[in-house]
Curated annotation (Swiss-Prot):
CDD domains: serpinP_plants. The record marks A371, S372 as: Reactive bond. The keyword Nucleotidyltransferase does not apply. GO terms for molecular function: serine-type endopeptidase inhibitor activity. Transmembrane segments: none annotated. Keywords: Protease inhibitor, Serine protease inhibitor. SUPFAM superfamilies: Serpins. One of its GO terms (cellular component) is extracellular space. Disulfide bonds: none annotated. Probable serine protease inhibitor. Belongs to the serpin family. This is Putative serpin-Z6C.
Length: 415
């Protein structure tokens, strides 16, 4: 029953992850002139948007709830609470005895020290994602405040991400910054043997080939074969006490289209199907493999996600004098406070997948600025799974289905 409740609660996160994958892919391709690799953390972005939603009203609230897949602030808070119970609390990211994954997720609300956070907003942020309200001096020393926030992110991500706010990203007009950081480090349930990793051709979307390092295995694998694509589940090792269970706590899923140029159409299907697509296409049992190869890869992302969110219908919150975030800060005595709006949503993510397992981290920062400032099918007995062409991937927490990391690989040699 508890797992069912968590999966229902996480449906909005899953839908957001699928839709953001499509939007971020398109944005990256437009900027670079060609398709590129992608990694991001849906959970990190969902967390900060959920906290901001706790202070929104009117159409601003409606648009945020629509993107997050919730009917009301109360329902969103309940959903966030279910996810928080499935993930380690801040400070709970120590490695588990017996080799379980190390996972840590934390949120923070950094407000101008001369302003008071509304109690309802502070309590909602704390209840949903254990986000502590921390006072900093944006007004007199924004650079020092920026460094303090970056230090928090670096500590939360084991220094994989040392900076989320670049110089100039906060100013004397900054009223509040909401941050989220996540760290993951897990070894495979069945590690790959480095000695048999070999260089083979990986077929890119542009028709060219690159030589990549492919991990291989003769072990039975969790693979599901569907119309036009296959799905591979690679579980991470659980702690010793959990190894008798049939379902590992965390897994990576690889979605491999049959066609070498089939990544975009597959991602369209994933976006349209949302949480139901993942549930319906999850491998349920191990099968014997014939040829099995998957490349090592190391990816990173560093960009604003404002454009992607706007294309998902979140618009008013980014408009000065239009955004309604009146439930975030207490009004000053004068009663003529400049209103807040979101000037930027910065996101960074990194992931490395190799023979031992996966290490990944992500951070998101939402900058709330006073508007007086300028806005900135049937399974065969034996299956080949050769990921030698572009594929999509997810890292999931199994009991809730929460998507920690998502992305795709179009060239495993391009970091």
């Amino acid at each position: 029953m508890e797992s069912c409740a968590r999966r229902c609660a996480v449906s909005g996160l899953t839908a957001l992850s699928m839709r953001l994958t499509k939007q971020l892919s398109a944005a990256a391709a437009s900027k670079a002139g060609a398709a590129g690799n992608l990694v991001f953390s849906p959970l990190s972005i969902y967390s900060v948007l959920s906290v901001v939603t706790a202070g929104a009203r009117g159409r601003t609230l409606t648009e945020l709830l629509g993107a997050l897949g919730a009917e009301s602030r109360e329902k969103l808070a309940a959903n966030a609470g279910e996810m928080a119970r499935a993930l380690p609390a801040p400070g709970g990211g120590a490695a588990q005895p017996g080799g379980g994954p190390r996972v840590a997720h934390a949120c923070g609300v950094w407000h101008e020290r001369t302003r008071t956070v509304r109690p309802a907003f502070r309590d909602a942020a704390a209840a949903s994602f254990n986000a502590a309200a921390l006072a900093v001096d944006f007004l007199n020393n924004p650079e020092e405040a920026r460094k303090e926030i970056n230090s928090w992110v670096a500590a939360a991500t084991e220094n994989l991400i040392d900076t989320i706010l670049p110089p100039g990203s906060v100013s004397t007009d900054t009223g509040l910054v909401v941050t989220s950081a996540i760290y993951f480090n897990g070894q495979w349930w069945t590690p790959f043997c480095k000695e048999i990793t070999e260089k083979r051709a990986f077929h890119r979307l542009d028709g060219g080939d690159v030589e990549a390092d492919f991990m291989r295995s003769g072990e039975d694998q969790y693979i599901a074969v569907h119309d036009g694509f296959k799905v591979l589940k690679m579980p991470y090792a659980a702690c010793v006490s959990a190894r008798t269970t049939t379902t590992p706590r965390y897994s990576m899923y690889v979605f491999l289209p049959d066609e070498r140029d089939g990544l975009w159409s597959l991602e369209d299907r994933m976006a349209a199907g949302g949480e139901g697509f993942l549930r319906e296409h999850t491998p349920e049992r191990r099968v014997e493999v014939g040829e099995f190869r998957i490349p090592r890869f190391k990816l990173s992302f560093d960009d604003s996600v404002v454009g992607a969110l706007q294309r998902l219908g979140v618009r008013d919150v980014f408009k000065p004098f239009v955004a309604d975030l009146a439930d975030v800060l207490e009004a000053e005595n004068s009663g003529d406070d400049p209103p807040l709006f979101v000037s930027d949503v910065k996101h960074k993510a990194v992931i490395e997948v190799n023979e031992e397992g996966t290490e990944a981290a992500a951070a998101t920062a939402v900058c709330l600025t006073f508007a007086s400032a300028a806005p900135s099918s049937r399974r065969p007995a034996r299956v080949d799974f050769v990921a030698d062409h572009p594929f999509a991937f997810l890292v999931l927490e199994e009991s809730s289905g929460a998507v920690l990391f998502a992305g795709h690989v179009v060239d495993p040699t391009d970091e």
